Amino acid sequence: MILPITIYSDEVLRRKAKPLKGIDTSHEELIGNMIESMRNASGIGLAAPQIGLSMRLLIVDLSPVQGYENAEPMVVINPHILAVKGYNAMEEGCLSIPDIHADVVRPSSIQLKYRNEHFEERVDEFSALMARVLQHEIDHLDGTLFVDKLQRRDRRKVQKSLEDIAAGKVHTTYPVAEINQGAKAS
């Protein structure tokens, strides 16, 4: 089932998401719906707050990106970045902030502790695009948006567009949730 994407200015995007204590069949169904919703919106990452849920769950699927066509969707639960290395700038966008793109500086590689879709604990290292997408989605779990990381002059360039989105002036090819609907129970 395709779920509506929560848009900039909705309060759930600004809250620190709650950790999951385990997963059951309802979470498995949610994960499937998140993957379907992300693909429908032509995204490569989606965090639970982006569908209105305050839980530390995210999905990454780089398969639409050239060079990553064989990548499988990755489920990340309760992530915690243990270490970072190197920094680089790269253009980012966000399904919750349609039509805005800007360069964001992030670590180029990370060591991540998380639980997978079977709730098994993992510690893995990620670099390049995967590291960037994971950090972007983890930011969502912490109530941070990529526009919060912009330098002042870059933020000024997108401010009017952000105000338009907050006012409901949003045009997407995917369904969006009503703004300020609040967080749903997890």
Swiss-Prot record:
InterPro entries for this protein: Peptide_deformylase, Peptide_deformylase_sf
Record: active site: 137
MF GO annotations: metal ion binding; peptide deformylase activity
CDD domains (UniProt xref): Pep_deformylase
Chain positions recorded as Fe cation binding sites: 94, 136, 140
Reaction catalysed by this enzyme: N-terminal N-formyl-L-methionyl-[peptide] + H2O = N-terminal L-methionyl-[peptide] + formate
Protein biosynthesis found in the keyword field: yes
Cofactor: Fe(2+)
EC nos: 3.5.1.88
GO biological process: co-translational protein modification; translation
Details of cofactor binding: Binds 1 Fe(2+) ion.
Pfam families reported for this sequence: Pep_deformylase
Similarity-based family: Belongs to the polypeptide deformylase family.
Protein's UniProt name: Peptide deformylase
